[in-house]
């Protein structure tokens, strides 16, 4: 039965979950994932699509592009947006559990645990949370960059990584913040992680002298030199925070 009453907080949480996982431009009633979620919630695909667009209107980057939802959208929409953006760690995890419960599944059904049989209690619960959130973060970052490397535009998802700008080991509170993420291919992710490349405040790629001295190598000429000084491909939403990029340049990048 199709619902017509007001949206609940639980429903909006799972709609925002989908908002994070779909590339911008796919928030429409004909999208298979929109239709699937509408069926789960007992809503029409049009209603779910409209909620997705309403969430988009809160994103500062999309606001600059003139993206608008309903002029008088629900205050609860804004509440959910703010809650996620203030606490990605908990809300992402909660949204995965709510969605899994609605589908009658385990939130970690598709996630493999190498030593799961040896874990118990809080230790296992903590690992589950980390893995569930890692999976969510990856989907969010890849979708925001339309499944392309920000440096070379490689479009193969199996070769893409949701790179953290400020590493987990430095600030665990940022590990789920999408503004602390960049989608990169495996090559450029490793170079970024090792400080061989970075990004300036104009979102242009900078390359370490460690790489530049190898400029005669064909692999370096193909994989790095063409992108130096070029603006990286920016995401449709959750643009990298400049203060995180500054941290990377000052603490990880090798000039």
Q: Where would I find each of the regions flagged by the language model?
A:
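Short helix->loop/beta-hairpin flanking segments within DNA-binding domains
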Residues: 19-29
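Short Lys/Arg-enriched helix C-cap and helix-to-coil transition segments
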Residues: 60-80
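Short, charged surface segments at domain edges that flank catalytic/cofactor-binding sites
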Residues: 110-148, 154, 166-179
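Major-groove recognition helix of helix-turn-helix-like DNA-binding domains
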Residues: 43-58
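A detector for short metal-coordination/catalytic motifs
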Residues: 136, 154-157, 167-255
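The −1 position to Zn-ligating cysteines in a subset of zinc-ribbon hairpins
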Residues: 44, 148, 161, 184
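Short alpha-helical "recognition helix" segments of helix-turn-helix
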Residues: 33-38
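Short, Lys/Arg-enriched anionic-surface-contact patches
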Residues: 1-18, 128
């Amino acid at each position: 039965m199709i619902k017509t009453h007001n949206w609940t907080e639980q429903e909006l949480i799972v709609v925002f979950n989908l908002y994070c996982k779909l590339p911008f431009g796919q928030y429409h009633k004909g999208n298979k994932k929109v239709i699937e979620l509408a069926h789960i919630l007992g809503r029409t695909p049009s209603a779910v699509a409209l909620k997705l667009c309403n969430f988009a209107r809160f994103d500062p980057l999309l606001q600059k592009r003139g993206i608008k939802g309903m002029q008088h959208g629900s205050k609860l929409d804004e509440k959910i947006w703010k809650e996620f953006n203030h606490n990605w760690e908990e809300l992402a995890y909660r949204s995965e559990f709510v969605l899994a419960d609605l589908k009658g599944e385990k939130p970690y059904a598709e996630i493999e645990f190498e030593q799961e049989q040896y874990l118990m209690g809080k230790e296992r619960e903590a690992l589950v949370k980390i893995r569930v959130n890692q999976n969510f973060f990856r989907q969010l970052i890849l979708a925001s960059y339309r499944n392309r490397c920000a440096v070379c535009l490689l479009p193969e998802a199996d070769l893409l990584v949701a790179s953290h700008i400020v590493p987990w080991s430095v600030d665990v509170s940022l590990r789920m913040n999408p503004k602390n993420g960049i989608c990169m291919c495996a090559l450029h992710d490793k170079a970024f992680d090792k400080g061989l490349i970075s990004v300036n405040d104009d979102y242009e790629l900078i390359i370490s002298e460690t790489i530049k001295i190898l400029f005669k190598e064909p692999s370096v000429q193909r994989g790095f030199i063409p992108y130096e000084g070029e603006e990286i491909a920016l995401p449709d939403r959750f643009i990298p925070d400049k203060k995180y990029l500054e941290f990377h340049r000052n603490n990880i990048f090798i000039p």
